[in-house]
């Protein structure tokens, strides 16, 4: 059997040796972020709907330097071989990072990270969409990250949910996302790219990781949860509560953007 001789054979999962340093030898991680924003504050958000004229619905969102645009196409008829699946619609999500969006230039071909993010995005959005109202139909959600400055998955969930609402897709509730970076006993809500992958990732000891949560705010139900790293159970529970609070902080901005889009599409009053 031919093998790849240039591939470095290593374990499927590995941990940083810095995690096993004794507390007295480990350097102290920062307890607060730099600047005027507090640890529990989200970045200022700019949101608009209906920017892509060719799509059934679209949305654009900015959170700091993170910029994401989403387009929704459908529902369109689809043929399936499995008769049991024809009673409900199908939600297809495509998550892509623009080659110029990250510090290191990427490729147009979708990589494994983008495929994983696409699957997580679909799992987060599906509980909020009334797929039973669209039998034998398919709804395509295309997300493009124009600039990655952290918390892209959470803001992609919010942007895609706004685009679905702008397209007139029936939903149980809007879906909002929030990310938290945990470092020891301190946490950062809506972290930037530097906070996700910079000095904060060099923390030591336990309770190190990131948590991304998707929430249906009116129903107060969690539709998606993605956690990386190693955290205690009580720390993870508190991180989820903090992310839920962050989602509720975004809700007025999203509601205002959707209201503005509806008023713009509404026909003028008859004289």
From Swiss-Prot:
Annotated stretches, region: Disordered: 1-39
Q: Which compartments is it annotated to reside in? A: Cytoplasm; Nucleus, Nucleolus; Nucleus
The UniProt keyword set, sorted, is: Cytoplasm, Exosome, Nucleus, RNA-binding, rRNA processing
Under Gene3D superfamilies, the record lists:
GHMP Kinase, N-terminal domain
TM segment ranges: none
Q: Which CDD domains match?
A: RNase_PH_MTR3 (cd11371)
The superkingdom listed in its UniProt entry is Eukaryota
* The protein's role, per its UniProt record: Non-catalytic component of the RNA exosome complex which has 3'->5' exoribonuclease activity and participates in a multitude of cellular RNA processing and degradation events.
Protein name as catalogued: Exosome complex component MTR3
Q: Name one GO biological process term.
A: U4 snRNA 3'-end processing
The entry sums up its family as follows: Belongs to the RNase PH family.
> What GO CC terms are in its UniProt record?
cytoplasmic exosome (RNase complex); exosome (RNase complex); nuclear exosome (RNase complex); nucleolus
A molecular function (GO) held by this record is: RNA binding
Report the gene name: exosc6
Residue pairs linked by disulfide bridges in the UniProt entry: none
Q: Where is the composition biased (Basic and acidic residues)?
A: 1-12
């Amino acid at each position: 059997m031919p093998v790849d001789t240039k591939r470095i054979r290593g374990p499927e999962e590995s941990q940083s040796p810095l995690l096993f340093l004794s507390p007295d030898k480990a350097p102290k991680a920062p307890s607060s972020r730099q600047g005027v924003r507090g640890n529990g504050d989200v970045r200022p958000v700019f949101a608009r709907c209906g920017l892509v004229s060719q799509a059934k619905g679209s949305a654009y969102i900015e959170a700091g330097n993170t910029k994401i645009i989403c387009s929704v196409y459908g529902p369109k008829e689809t043929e399936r071989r499995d008769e049991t699946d024809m009673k409900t619609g199908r939600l297809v999500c495509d998550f892509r990072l623009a080659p110029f969006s990250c510090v290191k230039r990427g490729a147009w071909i979708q990589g494994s990270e983008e495929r994983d993010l696409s699957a997580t995005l679909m799992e987060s959005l599906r509980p909020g969409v009334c797929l039973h109202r669209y039998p034998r139909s398919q709804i395509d959600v295309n997300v493009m990250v124009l600039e990655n400055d952290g918390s892209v998955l959470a803001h992609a969930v919010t942007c895609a949910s706004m685009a679905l609402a702008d397209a007139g897709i029936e939903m149980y509730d809007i879906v909002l996302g929030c990310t938290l970076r945990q470092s020891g006993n301190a946490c950062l809500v809506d972290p930037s790219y530097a906070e996700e992958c910079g000095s904060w990732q060099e923390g030591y000891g336990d309770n190190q990781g990131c948590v991304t949560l998707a929430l249906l705010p009116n129903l107060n139900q969690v539709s998606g949860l993605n956690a990386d790293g190693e955290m205690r159970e009580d720390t993870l529970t508190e991180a989820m509560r903090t992310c839920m609070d962050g989602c509720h902080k975004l809700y007025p901005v999203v509601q205002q953007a959707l209201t503005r889009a509806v008023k713009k599409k509404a026909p003028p009053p008859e004289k």
